[in-house]
Structures are given as structure tokens and as C-alpha cells.
């Protein structure tokens, strides 16, 4: 092979590049995002040591954003230096029109119902959940559902028993989520960035962009 043939061979474009130049509309210009995943044991450790780092507020913000993804999107954040406070709730729903709720695609979206949420990092989760439910009900605002989210592990039988007791006592449905629920939902690919954005896990997330097509 002489030099001219070799130079011609080297200069020839790849078939994909040639076709892309001729028919760009037939090729995707989307980007694929690769990011490192969060280790479950590391995230579990961070949930367990939130109080040591005074990250109660960051955890509350994270839980609200996670609940917006997994339970209902129309949650309003509480204001003030420490959320909750006189409002008795850490977050609650705000009313929206049925047209907006329809486009959410959720079967149980509270369009006009009032749902209240309590978030806790306390070790005595049972006392805290009971106190939160009583405080929320004392407002007389007509809440029809209460969610308590704890950063602690809770035995299933104990959680179910307290849910039933509180629901029966106050006449509304009470749901309690613990650390297992938080871990399972957070580690889903669609939710991992929430923990990173809220500065919960002390890790560096490496991003890599790749052109698809």
C-alpha cells in the first residue's frame, strides 16, 4: 500500500459519522448521564448520625422532597429557622385543581384533602410519633391523613400496632415510615440526587456525559 492509499484510508470518515453528516435528523443528540451510586451502608450510617451533625433541618427538607416524589407532589414547606414549630406539622398539602391533579397521574393525590407530615430523627420514635399526631390533631384543621417519617429502624409489628392504635384513637389514617422505607426509596435511581442535593451523604458524585446516537 503506497502513501497516497494509506492517507486516503486514514482520512475516510466512519460510516456513522458520514451518515450523521448526511442525515442529522435521523440521529439522536441526547446526552446520557452516568453518576456514581450511593452505598446503602453509607446512607444508613448518615441517617443514624443525623443528630450528631445537627442535620435535622437538612433531613426534613430531604424527606419533604422524597415524599413529593413518592406520596404526593403538592407539599408546602414550613418557614422559619426551625421548621414545624407553631405550625405543628413539618409539611402539609395545599389544595390544587382537579385538572392539575389529573396531569400528575396519581391515583391518591389529595386535590383538596389536607394531609399532614411529621419528620423525626429522635431515638424514641414511638413517643415522638404519638406526640406529633396529637399535636397535629389539636390544630382542628381537618386533616384526613397523617404521615410520620422517622430516621430510625422500626420493627414491623410495632409500627403496625402504633399505626392502628393512633388511627383508631383519632379517627383518621396514620401511616408511619421508617429508615427501611427511606433507604429503599432513596436508592432508587430517580431519587439518589435528592440525598446529594440536600447534602446528606458525605460523598462526591462523579458525573459523566455521553452523547447518544
Where are these regions (language model features)?
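Mixed-charge (Asp/Glu-Lys/Arg
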Residues: 1-213
Amino acid at each position: 500500500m503506497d502513501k497516497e492509499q494509506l492517507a486516503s484510508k486514514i482520512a475516510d470518515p466512519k460510516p456513522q459519522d458520514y451518515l450523521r453528516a448526511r442525515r442529522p435528523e435521523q440521529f439522536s443528540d441526547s446526552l446520557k448521564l452516568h453518576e456514581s451510586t450511593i452505598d446503602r451502608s453509607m446512607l444508613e450510617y448518615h441517617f443514624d448520625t443525623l443528630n450528631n451533625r445537627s442535620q435535622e433541618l437538612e433531613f426534613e427538607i430531604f424527606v419533604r422532597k422524597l415524599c413529593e416524589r413518592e406520596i404526593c407532589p403538592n407539599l408546602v414547606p414550613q418557614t422559619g429557622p426551625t421548621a414545624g414549630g407553631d405550625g405543628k406539622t413539618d409539611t402539609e398539602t395545599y389544595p390544587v385543581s382537579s385538572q392539575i391533579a389529573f396531569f400528575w397521574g396519581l391515583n391518591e393525590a389529595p386535590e383538596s384533602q389536607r394531609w399532614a407530615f411529621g419528620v423525626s430523627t429522635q431515638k424514641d420514635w414511638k413517643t415522638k410519633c404519638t406526640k406529633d399526631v396529637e399535636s397535629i390533631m389539636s390544630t382542628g384543621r381537618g386533616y384526613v391523613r397523617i404521615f410520620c417519617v422517622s430516621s430510625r429502624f422500626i420493627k414491623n409489628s410495632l409500627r403496625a400496632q402504633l399505626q392502628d392504635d393512633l388511627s383508631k384513637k383519632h379517627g383518621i389514617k396514620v401511616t408511619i415510615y421508617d429508615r427501611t422505607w427511606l433507604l429503599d426509596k432513596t436508592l432508587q435511581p430517580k431519587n439518589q440526587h435528592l440525598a446529594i442535593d440536600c447534602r446528606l451523604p458525605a460523598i462526591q458524585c462523579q458525573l459523566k456525559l455521553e452523547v447518544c446516537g
